[in-house]
């Protein structure tokens, strides 16, 4: 007799390994929820989005370093700059970008709980929302909008990541 899940997966165009289990199997006879894994295209887009988000983050760090040095004086070296990025509230607004890159990293490298298709779409949506340059938005969106106005390089990279996030 054929496993009903195998038949359902094959009928939907997938293979049984295209489904992953979310949540523990209950001792009460309930089955864990099975979710479709992210497609190869979604995983590739996540990897590309991560790479481009890192480029945006680097460009923002460079732009913010210039802004900081204009306001407060020259930063001695890269080590001092790193300490400022970590500890100075001036750079707090950049944390959502770093956290998004880290989240994509963690989820795409988790072999025990692979990224699901719905989760991949959610990550794309979260990144799109974060990258909305809005002078009236949250701190990141306001300062991102300002940085885009002053850095053509950043604007080009931001456009590239936007295209990837929108599929």
Predicted regions and their residues:
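Surface-exposed peri-terminal alpha-helical interaction modules
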Residues: 2-13, 18-167
């Amino acid at each position: 007799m054929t496993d009903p899940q195998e038949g359902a997966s094959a009928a939907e165009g997938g293979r049984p390994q295209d489904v992953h289990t979310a949540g523990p199997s209950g001792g009460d006879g309930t089955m864990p929820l099975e979710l479709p894994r992210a497609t190869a295209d979604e995983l590739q887009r996540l990897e590309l989005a991560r790479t481009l988000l890192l480029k945006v983050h680097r460009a923002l760090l460079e732009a913010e370093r210039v802004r900081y040095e204009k306001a407060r004086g020259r930063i001695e070296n890269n080590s001092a700059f790193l300490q400022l990025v970590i500890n100075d509230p001036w750079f707090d607004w950049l944390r959502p970008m770093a956290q998004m890159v880290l989240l994509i990293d963690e989820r795409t490298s988790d072999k025990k709980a692979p990224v699901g298709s719905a989760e991949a779409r959610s990550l794309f949506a979260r990144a799109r929302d974060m990258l909305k340059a809005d002078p009236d938005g949250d701190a990141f969106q306001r300062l991102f909008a300002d940085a885009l106005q002053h850095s053509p390089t950043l604007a080009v990279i931001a456009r590239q990541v936007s295209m990837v996030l929108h599929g």
